[in-house]
Amino acid sequence: METKQYPDMECDVVIAGCGVAGLYAALNLPTSMRVIMLSKGAVDECDSMLAQGGICVLPEGSDYDAFFEDTMHAGHYENRRESVDIMIRSSRSVINDLLAMGVDFERKADGSLDFTREGAHSRPRIAFHADITGKEITTKLLQAVRKLDNVQILEHVAMTDILTGERDGATVCTGVVAVPVDEDNSLRPADELANVAEGVHAGELFKIHARHTLWATGGIGGVYDHSTNYPQLTGDACYIAQEHGIKMEHLDYVQIHPTGLFSPQPGRTFLISESCRGEGAILLNAAGERFTDELQPRDVVAAAIREQMKQDGTEHEWLSFAPVECDVVTGHFANIRARCLEDGRDILDEPIPVTPTQHYFMGGVWVDKDGRTSMPELYAAGETACNGVHGKNRLASNSLLESLVWGRRAAWRMRTGESLAVEQAGEPALDGRHRALSADTLAIDDLARAASTQAVEE
């Protein structure tokens, strides 16, 4: 692939990453602000696209305490309580925005949202779209962003460093250094891409000067032999943060998902969603015996599988869909079934081999409740950031929600210099109606208004 060359650029906001955190941040900025977004690979090669199970939401105000406790319990009570509170109370307005952008969540016969349950959840509270929720959400947000004249997306462009300046005696971020990359170079971490000796010509580097910078570069799965992540996610923001003395937190908090589809080959591992176990799928050992409670937190289930593998002397255990109703398998888990059929296994007829696999990074670049890092004018959101909401171990389906909440909060802080107020528990109504956050018009306000008008006309 021949890479495109770019001149130095200027904008109001540069966003490194095109997952849900970056896209939603762009939508929550006014159209008067010029935004440049970078995607290290193709724009659809982000981990947000891979999220299967769903996105958590507070179904009603009475679930607040249970939702809070489930999140804290899964995180071994090492979570930042303020962050957990913000995420939960922000969930309903975020879901309404997604509905307003056309996200097609599953519904009950009466038209209300349907919810599924996953491990360590005390009740169903996860909105979903079959078993490709992340793809549905990310695709709709990307379609919305592509309608904005003020946003420019640069595909196959990697961030290699940040630009800095001085303000009131302090070092501030003033943008990023970037480089066009082909498919092979997209798998390299930032330190290699910035090193001319490693094969990147110095003349290809270019600067993007910006008032505000948002890191939304995803996780670290690319540094593992077996991961559910895209291989170009190589922890670039963490490397750059280390080089500039930017505060990081809990870099050892890496989540291993219990059920990756086993393959002896290196490369990205296909995820078998936790919602499968939430709907009744069970784990079996080599003798066909159930050996653990499948709905415990992820780290507990992963440890149980590893221990059973050690006892059995195997590289995997088995996941059986026998207890799951046939129409749930063919409907809710159609994508998972299709992928397993590629390996010659029909989950309707036989169990599939699963093994614990690197999945998520709870640590990262430290941020506050508004997504601000320790360097002024530098923000981070999504898996790149550590706002403490997940503690030591993430609760299933909190990742998409957290990314969206902090993407929006970062955008608000950039625009106003203030913290975004948080809704009361149980508000607003889950009616799919976008509610403007201020008198100033944001990009999402215009898009939601246009979508509503079109729906009425149709």
Residue ranges and their predicted role:
Residues 1-5, 9-11, 20, 28, ...:
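Glycine- and aromatic-enriched mobile tails/lids
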Residues 8-11, 189, 201-212, 374-377:
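Core beta-strand elements of the Rossmann-like FAD/NAD(P) dinucleotide-binding domain
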Residues 13-37:
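N-terminal Rossmann-like FAD-binding beta1-loop-alpha1 element of flavoenzymes
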Residues 14-16, 208-218, 380:
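Short hydrophobic core segments
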Residues 41-72, 76, 255-258, 266-270:
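Conserved N-terminal glycine-rich FAD pyrophosphate-binding loop of Rossmann-like flavoproteins
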Residues 43, 240, 246-352, 413-419, ...:
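An anion/pyrophosphate-binding glycine-rich loop and adjacent beta-alpha core
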Residues 100-187, 203-204, 209, 216, ...:
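Conserved redox-cofactor binding core of oxidoreductases
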Residues 212-266, 270, 398-406:
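Glycine-rich loop(s) and the adjacent beta-strand/alpha-helix scaffold that form part
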